[in-house]
Amino acid sequence: MATAPGPAGIAMGSVGSLLERQDFSPEELRAALAGSRGSRQPDGLLRKGLGQREFLSYLHLPKKDSKSTKNTKRAPRNEPADYATLYYREHSRAGDFSKTSLPERGRFDKCRIRPSVFKPTAGNGKGFLSMQSLASHKGQKLWRSNGSLHTLACHPPLSPGPRASQARAQLLHALSLDEGGPEPEPSLSDSSSGGSFGRSPGTGPSPFSSSLGHLNHLGGSLDRASQGPKEAGPPAVLSCLPEPPPPYEFSCSSAEEMGAVLPETCEELKRGLGDEDGSNPFTQVLEERQRLWLAELKRLYVERLHEVTQKAERSERNLQLQLFMAQQEQRRLRKELRAQQGLAPEPRAPGTLPEADPSARPEEEARWEVCQKTAEISLLKQQLREAQAELAQKLAEIFSLKTQLRGSRAQAQAQDAELVRLREAVRSLQEQAPREEAPGSCETDDCKSRGLLGEAGGSEARDSAEQLRAELLQERLRGQEQALRFEQERRTWQEEKERVLRYQREIQGGYMDMYRRNQALEQELRALREPPTPWSPRLESSKI
C-alpha cells in the first residue's frame, strides 16, 4: 500500500480518525471546523474522520520535520493547524479522560475500555490485510521514525500539558472502539487503497481489534525518536502519555495455574460427553457430523446406483441397436441371395420410377398359400409319426397275444392227450372186470374179497375220470375264449392297419396335389417375371 505524506498546507492527521462519533451539535462542529482546511468532502458534508493517507502522514511527520528543520529555525506556531488540536480546544469536555471524570449519559457510553482484542471478528478481513501490507511495506521507515502504540501507552509522562491530554484521549478512544455498535465505524483507507479498517455494509464487526497487534510492530522505539531536541512533534508528545489502565486481565496468570485448571476442564468435558440427555455441545456436534456423514454416504450410494443404472441402460440400448443392425444385415443378405438365385426382380435404372406391378398381389397370395401348405404338411407329418408309433405298439401287443395263444394251445393239446390216455385206461379196466367174474362161479371168501377190491378200484377210477373230464371241459372253454379274443384283436388290428394305410394314401395324394399346384404357381410367377415381348405387326407375304 503506497502512501505519501500530504503537502504542508493540508491539515495534519491524527489518531482522531479512530475515534467514534460523539454527541455534539452540528453548530458546534461547524464553528470548530470553520478555519480548518480539508475537513469537508466535495459534496459539502463533514468528514467523520481522517483517511489512512493522513494517518500515515501523521506517523511520518517527525522524520519529515527533522529534515525540514535543518535549514530553518524552529518557531512556535501560534495557531494550531491540525484537526485534533482545534477540535479539543473548542470542546474540552470531549478530551477530558482523567480518572475523576465520569461518563455522562448518552455521551461516553461507547468510550469505555473493553477487552476487544479477544472478541471474535466476522468481517471480510480487508482491514487486517491493509494493516499487514502497511506493516510489510512501511516497516523500515516506521521503525526508524515512529514508535509502537505499546511504547506510547506504557511510558510515563514527561511534560504533561494540553497536547498530552489530547493525545491521551485520542489513544483511549482508539483502544475503546466498540465492535458491536449499530453505526458504521470510520474508514482508514482512501479511495486508492484496497482495504479499510471500516466496516462495510452487510459485514460483521470491524477487525480492528485483531489488527492492533500489528501497530505494535510498525516502528522502532519511540524513545530513540524522542531523544533528539529537533523531534518536537505530536509523536513526541504522545510518548509522554501516562500508563493507561489495562483493557483486560488474564484469567490464569501463570503456567502452573493453567496446568491446575486443565484436569478439571478435561473432567468436565468427559462428564459432558457421558451425558445421555444429549445436551452437551460436543455430543451434539458429533451427532450432527455423523448425520452429515450418513447423508453424504447415502448421496454417494444413490449417485453410484444411478450411474450403474445409466450404464446398464446404455448397454441395453447398444445391444438393441446391434441386434437391429444384424437383422438389417440379414435381410440385406437374403435379398442379395434371392437376387443371385434369379428370384428377385430385375434392377431398374436409378432415374426411373418404380412401375406398378399387377402381379405383386397374386405373388404375395401364392407365397402365403405355400407357407400355409408347408405348415399343413409339417402337421400331417407329425400326425403320421404319431400313428406309426401307435401302430408299432399295437403290433407288439398282437405279437405278445400270439405267443400266449401258442402256449395255451400247446397246454390244451397236452391235456387232451392225457385225457385220451385216461379214457383208454378206464375202458380197459371196464372190459377186464366182467371177464374175471364169468369163470369164477363158486363164490369163495377170496373171490369175494377180490371182487370188493375190484369194485373199490373201479369207483376210484370213475371219480378220477370225471375229474379229468371236468378239467378238460374247462380247458376247452378257456381255449375257445382265447381264440375268440385273438380273433377280435386280429380284426381290430386289421381295421387299424387299413385306416392307417388309407390315411397315408390320402396324405400322399394331398402332398402330390400341393406339389403340382406349387409347380404351376412357380411357372406362373416365372412367366410374370419374364419381360413382355415387344409387339410386332404380322407380316404377310405378297407372294402367292
Curated annotation (Swiss-Prot):
Its main location: cytoplasm. It is found in: Cytoplasmic vesicle; Cell projection, Axon; Cell projection, Dendrite. Residues 294-530 form a coiled coil. Keywords: Cell projection, Coiled coil, Cytoplasmic vesicle, Developmental protein, Immunity, Innate immunity, Neurogenesis, Phosphoprotein. One of its GO terms (biological process) is innate immune response. GO terms for cellular component: axon; cytoplasmic vesicle; dendrite. Pfam families: Fez1 (PF06818). Residues 186-222 have a biased composition (Low complexity). Residues 61-84, 116-252, 335-365, 430-465 are annotated as: Disordered. InterPro entries: N4BP3. The modification Phosphoserine is found at S176. It comes from the Eukaryota. Binds NEDD4. Interacts with 14-3-3 proteins. Interacts with MAVS. Belongs to the N4BP3 family. Plays a positive role in the antiviral innate immune signaling pathway. Mechanistically, interacts with MAVS and functions as a positive regulator to promote 'Lys-63'-linked polyubiquitination of MAVS and thus strengthens the interaction between MAVS and TRAF2. Also plays a role in axon and dendrite arborization during cranial nerve development. May also be important for neural crest migration and early development of other anterior structures including eye, brain and cranial cartilage. This is NEDD4-binding protein 3. The gene is N4BP3.
